[in-house]
Amino acid sequence: MFIRMFLYAKSNKEAVGICNDILSNIDLYTEKKEIVEIAPYWKIEGIFQIELSVVLKSNSIDNEDLERLLKTFSNIWLSYGQPIDEILITRKLDGSIMYNEKIEMINIFFDSEKIIAS
């Protein structure tokens, strides 16, 4: 799984701390999380882009687990693909409530062998 996060932060260190806090609920489902890249987002000052590679445990996340996890980020998200291979969480969606004010947007991409049946 690949996760790209856009977070409000003042430094790399702060962005990593926010990222770890936000993703603490995913630890139950992962064998390994690794930050691949972190940098200020060139389009918007005050936002950092963090990219993570995540190795899921042998059992894929089922729909119930996924929904429970997503509800820790926001009340609304978009999913793409059949079966689902991408999820978008963004404060730009009408009615969206982010449960961490530091989140601007999160993209979650699922590996082909770990795709969720919808």
Which residues make up each language-model segment?
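Short secondary-structure junctions
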Residues: 26-34, 78-83
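Short edge beta-strands and adjacent turn/loop segments
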Residues: 33-48
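Charged interaction segments
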Residues: 45-118
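Short, extreme N-terminal segment that most often corresponds to the first beta-strand
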Residues: 1-25
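Generic alpha-helix signal with a bias toward terminal, lower-confidence helices
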Residues: 17-21, 38, 89
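Generic non-transmembrane alpha-helical segments
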Residues: 18-29, 72, 76
